[in-house]
């Protein structure tokens, strides 16, 4: 399973990319708005940092406008992926963009049927939302497993991006469930990096080294 970072914060992207485990970036209108910067400016800077897929999301709700927005996003950089909401209009846009050779990421997926429809429409990626399903008492990991099984059974090349990842356990369970990618907030990466036994082990090594020098 590969890692994308789910943020539009350039400093977070730089810090994560420096550690070598980031393969791409996902953004959405909320994340970009949080930065208080121009969308194109933010995306251009991100593409200069990470050499991998960068998802930028449309804000229109009808297919024709999504297609036009998608074409504009795709022209920003060859690594751009157009993020499209899981609706009938969204899938109509995915079909056209796919035919034009533009990569798409269908977002806000909450069922295996939605994922299958998106894949058959030509989506490069589907993004099932793990944490938001957990919030309403559903099991997001069952959804990941179901989608992975369906895609494998039918030889569907669409990749699964686990989204709405809230904590390190989500990450491990997504990897076990068959997700191709987990898109993870920087704060969760920070949690994944740390373990109290690692810290105490480092302290002991340093203490032993200092004692040996005396």
Curated annotation (Swiss-Prot):
Positions of the catalytic residues: 83 (schiff-base intermediate with substrate)
InterPro entries: Aldolase_TIM, TAL/FSA, Transaldolase_3B, Transaldolase_3B/F6P_aldolase, Transaldolase_AS, TSA/FSA_arc/bac
Matching PROSITE patterns: TRANSALDOLASE_1, TRANSALDOLASE_2
UniProt enzyme class: transferase
GO molecular function: aldehyde-lyase activity; transaldolase activity
CDD domains in alphabetical order: Transaldolase_FSA
UniProt keyword list: Cytoplasm, Pentose shunt, Schiff base, Transferase
Family matches, as NCBIfam families: fsa_talC_mipB (TIGR00875)
Family named by the database record: Belongs to the transaldolase family. Type 3B subfamily.
Keyword flag Lipid biosynthesis: no
Biological process (GO), any one: carbohydrate metabolic process
Gene: tal1
Gene Ontology cellular-component terms listed: cytoplasm
Subcellular location: Cytoplasm
Catalytic activity: D-sedoheptulose 7-phosphate + D-glyceraldehyde 3-phosphate = D-erythrose 4-phosphate + beta-D-fructose 6-phosphate
Chief localisation class: cytoplasm
Organism of origin: Listeria innocua serovar 6a (strain ATCC BAA-680 / CLIP 11262)
EC number: 2.2.1.2
Pathways involved: Carbohydrate degradation; pentose phosphate pathway; D-glyceraldehyde 3-phosphate and beta-D-fructose 6-phosphate from D-ribose 5-phosphate and D-xylulose 5-phosphate (non-oxidative stage): step 2/3
Protein name: Probable transaldolase 1
Protein role: Transaldolase is important for the balance of metabolites in the pentose-phosphate pathway.
